[in-house]
A protein has these predicted regions:
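Hydrophobic alpha-helical membrane-embedded segments
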Residues: 21-41, 74-78, 111-122, 190
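Alpha-helical transmembrane segments and their membrane-interface junctions
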Residues: 71-90, 161-173
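Juxtamembrane helix-loop-helix connectors linking adjacent transmembrane helices
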Residues: 76-114
Length: 262
């Protein structure tokens, strides 16, 4: 019998709970952002749209539909994870005081850095392989002009790959549930900025010494419009180290800000 059926048996309440929580987070984060940036669209931010044309209704519905399927997949994966935790098969622990606050804080930093590395290599492999791109990753790239609704717009296999990182970590490293929650919040926020279609972070921030370490909306938007290079998620390190940064990053970024400073 498939593991997900065994895990769901007697845990349907948990499944629906996770599903509602994921949907709620998606509606609040993506829905509210879309409403503000694409429906209300105040003059104070309208000029910050990276691609001047607006996405079609078909593109938006595509993003919502596939994101909904991703949330369903993740709810099933969350229940399976609970199944493993209940049987003591993971290194998940409760109570921050168990291993101390210092460990808890550093575990969050570890999650962010290791997840960034995991995402880069999985993402790059899905582009380097024509087969993987066509059958796994191409759904996400149908968003040529992404909106906030694209943050979880994956096919089912890619949704599993994106969620698989959590499984790998909790079997290897002691992790508190609140540290995972912090990663989810950080990841969702980073994804939102990468796919919102607007560059809202001021130039003086993104051009600062610290700001240059992080991805920007313009950089990831270039990835969606060109499909090559700029594979990183949070930080720009992997693209720079592996020489997969788009050579036009700085040029396009400067042109964008020059256009908006007139």
């Amino acid at each position: 019998m498939p593991l997900f059926i065994i895990a769901l048996d007697g845990h349907l309440g948990l499944f629906y709970g996770f599903l509602l929580a994921f949907i709620g987070a998606y509606v609040i984060v993506a829905g509210v952002s879309f409403m503000f940036l694409y429906l209300v669209r105040p003059a104070s931010v309208a000029h910050l749209k990276i691609q001047q044309q607006m996405p079609s209704r078909k593109e938006v519905l595509h993003e919502i539909g596939w994101s909904s399927l991703t949330l369903l997949v993740w709810a099933v994966m969350a229940v399976i994870l609970i199944y493993f935790i209940d049987r003591g098969l993971t290194q998940m622990y409760s109570g921050i005081e168990s291993l101390g606050v210092t460990y808890f804080v550093f575990s969050i930093l570890f999650l962010v850095i290791s997840h960034d590395a995991y995402f880069y290599w999985v993402h790059r492999l899905m582009h380097d392989s024509d087969f993987a791109y066509k059958y796994i990753h191409s759904i996400h790239h149908e968003s040529k002009n992404p909106t906030p609704f694209a943050i979880f717009s994956f096919g089912p296999i890619e949704a599993v790959l994106m969620g698989l990182y959590v499984y790998l970590i909790v079997f290897l490293v002691p992790i508190n549930i609140y540290a995972l929650a912090a990663l989810f919040v950080f990841d969702t926020t980073a994804n939102l900025f990468g796919h919102m279609g607007y560059e809202l972070i001021p130039k003086k921030v993104t051009k600062s010494r610290i700001g240059r370490m992080f991805n920007t909306s313009v950089i990831h938007d270039l990835h969606h419009s060109g499909q090559q290079y700029n594979y990183s998620l949070y930080f720009r390190f992997w693209d720079k180290f592996m020489k997969t940064a788009n050579q036009d990053n700085e040029k396009v970024w400067e042109e964008f800000h020059a256009r908006n400073e007139k």
